Amino acid sequence: CITNNYKDINVELIDCMKYVNITIEKITTAAYREMAKKAPWAWGKIYADSQKGPLAHISSRSNKIMAIKLLKLLREKNPDLIISTHPFGSQMCSYLKRKQKITSKIATIMTDFAPHDQWLVGSEYTDYYFVAHNKMKQYLISKNIDENKIFDTGIPISNRFLLNYNKNDILSELNFTPNKKTVLFFGGGEFGLGKTKTVEIFECFVKLFPNIQIIAVAGKNEKMKTAFSKIVEQEKRNDSIRVLEFTNKVPEFMSVSDLVVTKPGGLTTSESLASKLPMVIINPIPGQEEENAQFLEENGIAIWIKKYDNPYEKLQNLFSDPKLLPTMKENTEKLSKKYSTQNICKILFN
């Protein structure tokens, strides 16, 4: 958005964690992946404990130490504005500003639908907060953050979600028909409830709803793709189900879908809301994803299939009530912020 619409502004994208210490970045990324895959409850506990107390203090102290190395880069680049989409980056920059080492404006973009206090460390030195919805804005205000620097713009998404797609052409490419409901099923994640539950839920859709078309995206997960394809073959549904690997056509597929089945990550959720898609939530990792799931369920946008839920029962209820999906779609419109990226840029640069 910046490079396309604000030609006089120089932009540089930097992974501050890799810059500060690539070894720590690799260790923390690997640890998160292993916990999310094998012991998601452990990540959930770390997430909760890092709100306040000893763990939050340790995190804050380590970010102050790492900020010293980041200072070298910031002095070299001397930016007018720093935009951060991670709490650690925001903390490091606000600490340097507090110590009068930098004078840059700082904009923090919170990338989930529930607040976490790690985002707010050093808030008095942050100039802009961009949040997903008004309740988050009210939470920040309750933490004594000046409401004039909080904007409920939504989480930034690709401008491809602003395009008008020819739905008939997209359906035709898939050999689908426009007079049937289409479900977009993201099953490539390797975290959360894992492969077994995901495959069980996919099988429910295939067996329960023969008149529904399904676009199943397995991503880079070969085992998931194989499992999906096997079910499709067994149920003789090759005519109305497409099992795909990684795709760059998410905006197009969302434009022709009536429902999305997905993990509730901040970006995918924002894209679904921009596309006005009701959601079936699967596999949320304890922590921010579970908080996202709770928010979406409470706002009548999503059905959350939990670990011990009967997916057959949940999905039967979803499709047996003719008013439920239309009502969920109406609810998405209340939180849809498809111009989030453009509005953030206008606030920062106009």
Model regions and ranges:
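Conserved N-terminal ligand/cofactor-binding loop architecture of enzyme catalytic domains
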Residues: 4-76
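A conserved, positively charged/aromatic
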Residues: 74, 102, 118-128
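A nucleotide-sugar donor-handling region in carbohydrate enzymes
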Residues: 127-190
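Donor-nucleotide binding loops and adjacent catalytic segments primarily
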Residues: 169, 176-256
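A donor-sugar binding/catalytic signature common to diverse glycosyltransferases
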Residues: 249-291
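C-terminal "capping" alpha-helix adjacent to the active site of nucleotide-linked donor transferases
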Residues: 297-300, 307-324
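A short, well-ordered alpha-helix in the C-terminal region of glycosyltransferases
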Residues: 324-338
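C-terminal alpha-helical cap of glycosyltransferases
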Residues: 337-350
